[in-house]
């Protein structure tokens, strides 16, 4: 009975979110911005987390905290548009072109016999849901996701991300195997590199000067497959005009320190579009943050920061 009840609630929620996805993007952004600010005003915990993260980065101002709250609301509600809008509508909207070119390059390499695959790393910046969705319109992509605890939200997430060309897989052993298989076929995989991994799946590396437990999965996948690695940001444009996709090849090893340094560079370009209310400095069960001493950090597996070249 409980399973049937969960299924019914999930079905209603999916239909509701699909209905939201039919609304114009400018309207969704306007509503999302208002809801994001309302949540910021009503939730002391949300305000505290946002302010603390901004202060850690040395970027705090009331104006930036307020605008980032609006951006977080837009990111949440625009997912309905990205997930459930017809493919043709997304192709008509600005922002898919860079992903289309990237997918075409991958297909061309496959046709030439180069099956090393592509690892796309998309931090919690702007409309990060749009990257895989746009890529999947041209070529297949397998994306890793962390399953929400609530089964209703889990069903919604899977329904939303299971769109044309996109295969979502859970962040567990089976999901990692699926990523490896996709890369060995010469296909693309998508990962949120600033998502806090479980103990044993990451290393400590500085993020805005503070140790953050950072996943080593991109590094392991790249070492096993020789795949091309790129970092992507999907910037939200004003007034609901669409998105601007920025793709950078990540030369060398995608180790945690390099990843965090490159993500920092991206965030500083448009800090209001980073999800500052995300608990990036969460300490996984069984882990202890390293002492602020370089020798102790190295002994504990904390990688010192790597500062990228000027201009990223």
Residue ranges and their predicted role:
Residues 1-122, 154-158, 163-165:
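Membrane-anchoring hydrophobic helices of lipid-metabolizing enzymes
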Residues 103-109, 132-133, 157-158, 179-180, ...:
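Short amphipathic alpha-helical segments and helix-helix/interface helices
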Residues 89-98, 146, 165-171, 207-209, ...:
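Short, flexible loop segments at the rims of nucleotide/cofactor-binding pockets, characterized by
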Residues 116-173, 199-206, 236:
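Catalytic core of membrane glycerolipid acyltransferases/transacylases, capturing the structured
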Residues 48-49, 147-151, 211-215:
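Active-site metal-coordination segments of metallo-dependent hydrolases
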Residues 2, 63-69, 112-114, 137-140, ...:
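Non-catalytic C-terminal accessory region of glycerolipid acyltransferases
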Residues 15, 49, 130, 156, ...:
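Short Gly/charged-rich anion-binding patches and loops
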